[in-house]
Regions:
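All-alpha amphipathic helical-bundle segments outside canonical DNA-binding/catalytic cores
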Residues: 80-83, 119-121, 137-153, 171-178
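N-terminal intrinsically disordered/low-complexity leader segments
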Residues: 1-5, 145
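Amphipathic alpha-helical packing segments from all-alpha helical-bundle domains
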Residues: 62-65, 69, 113-139, 148-152
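Helix-turn-helix
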Residues: 9, 17-51, 55
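C-terminal peripheral helix-coil segments that are non-catalytic and often amphipathic
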Residues: 91, 127-135, 156-157, 163, ...
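Short hydrophobic clusters on alpha-helical segments that form packing/core surfaces
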Residues: 10-18, 89, 184
Length: 189
């Protein structure tokens, strides 16, 4: 149990360093130094820097996938599902901004198998989001705009929210959700 806890501490420290410096610029020695231990000691808990990156990104991708699956099962309108997806992104941003930085910027540095798994999860997520948008258009809940433009506009904003949110200090999460949903939806309703 202690090993798992220590591994989680290592991953948390590394994710902060990855966000600050970028994955490529961070060494195992940097991670160890930030934790106040010797680099060799890290290998008792992890295989290497790439494993940390994979755990960060794949765990986050699974969280997005799980959230999407829960939203798809809801008996809500497409518009309500889009609102829930925006809220999902905000919740993840507020709680895991460091991991989001790695997911957005460093996913291509994972092992090939992990990259492939990530790409499948990302493409499935985007396809589900696209389907919800198309249903909203077909039901007249959304303006008849190109679904790709709507998807790109929403996801581009949400994927970079972690950069903006950190710079603005602690905003009330409920206020952020209310305003972000209103701003993004008004442009497509």
């Amino acid at each position: 149990m202690k090993t798992t806890s220590r591994k989680a501490e290592i991953i948390a420290e590394a994710s902060q360093l990855f966000k600050e410096k970028g994955y490529s610029a961070v060494t195992v020695r940097d991670i160890a130094q930030a934790m106040g231990i010797k680099a060799a000691s890290l290998y008792n808990h992890i295989e290497g820097k790439q494993e940390i990156l994979s755990v960060l990104i794949l765990d986050l991708a699974k969280e997005f996938t799980s959230g999407m699956n829960a939203i798809l099962k809801m008996n809500n309108s497409p518009l309500q599902k889009i609102e829930k997806l925006i809220e999902l992104h905000i919740d993840i941003t507020v709680n895991q901004s460091e991991a989001l930085a790695a997911l957005n910027n460093d996913w291509m540095h994972m092992a090939e198998t992990d990259v492939n798994n990530f790409v499948v999860m990302r493409e499935t997520y985007e396809e589900n989001f696209r389907t919800i948008i198309k249903e909203g258009i077909a039901q007249g809940q959304l303006q008849p705009r190109h679904p790709e433009v709507i998807l790109f506009s929403i996801l581009s904003t949400l994927r970079t929210l972690y950069l903006w949110y950190q710079k603005r200090g602690k905003l009330d999460v409920n206020l952020l959700k209310r305003d972000m949903v209103a701003v993004l939806i008004r442009g497509i309703v």
